Amino acid sequence: MRASPVHSSLDPRARQLLRTLISRYIRDGEPVGSQTLARHAGLDVSPATIRNILADLEDAGLLSSPHTSAGRIPTATGYRVFVDSLVQMRPPGEGEVARLRAEMSSAAGTQALLGSASELLSAMTHFVGVVSAPKREQFAFRHIDFVPLDARRVLAILVFADNEVQNRVIEPRKAYEPAELERVANYLNAHFAGRALADIRASLLRELRHARDEMELLLAHSVELAEQALAPAGDDMVLAGQTKLMGVQDLSDLERLRELFEIFASKREILQLLERTIQAPGVRIFIGEETGVVPLESVSLVTAPYMAGGQVLGVLGVIGPKRMDYDRVIPLVQTAADVLGAALDPNPPTER
């Protein structure tokens, strides 16, 4: 976590009061008054001194006073200072880590793993779990087959090294005979199995420049079919637990919930937000307006990239109210990212 400029200007008593107030508010969901802080902050100061410090924190934009209460609640800036400088991590226990590892088994296919990760994050936080899918071009393909569907359409069946199977309908510029499709599939399987999709097209084009006669025709056919069959698929993500937000007190406004569910359905804005975090190591936290997406201004997003084979594949995280238990959610998200990456790694450390 980075040090907040606002935090660095606070004295130890103000930091302790701010942490105690935000922790109590996260736990209880009620504005916190000076009497409560006097009992729980562990400071040997009078309620009057506490009130003065709270007034200073409010002037600094870290707290606000609801009109209906004498207590105070944190602002988005207050939460930012909290997660940057005052959070006290509570890593998941042995049982929780064992559950993550057991349910994100490397024996499952990638899509099943992503589904398990999002479901687990939702179940363990009671908020929304989200996982961006790895870009398929980062994966090696194991086998390809072409099946003619009609005069102009061909079904490409791709089997990847992580046991995922994708079916893609392509429309080549020319009609291919079954024997031609078989020759192209045999060529691609013999020469490119085990290679990442992103590498194959460039290699085909290089070989085509140096080929002659019959080999040139085979390579030309391979380039055309591979260009469509192995093209990058659209980005996607897996969400779980969206309906759990309906029971969150802070998100009880129906119009706000409707806008949130529209964002979940379209996926585009959340994918763009996750893309912003993919190259940043460690946990990233967006609080309210920091997301840059109006319907997400009432929530926080805690994310971490997951890696396999030294390569960042995607991002996972939790979407919940700003009043979430950051002490627990932050290390849980990081642990889940580590476990998912290990499950996706084709060469885990124990096998190297």
Q: Which ranges hold each PLM region?
A:
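Alpha-helical hairpin
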Residues: 9-10, 45, 74, 92
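Generic N-terminal leader/targeting and pre-domain segments
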Residues: 1-6, 23, 88-89
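Helix-turn-helix-type domain boundary/helix-start signal
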Residues: 7-8, 43, 72, 174
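N-terminal helix-turn-helix
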Residues: 20-21, 27, 31-87
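Conserved phosphate/pyrophosphate-binding and hydrolysis machinery centered on Walker-type P-loop NTPases
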Residues: 7, 11, 31, 44, ...
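A short glycine/serine-rich beta->alpha loop
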Residues: 4-6, 63-68, 323
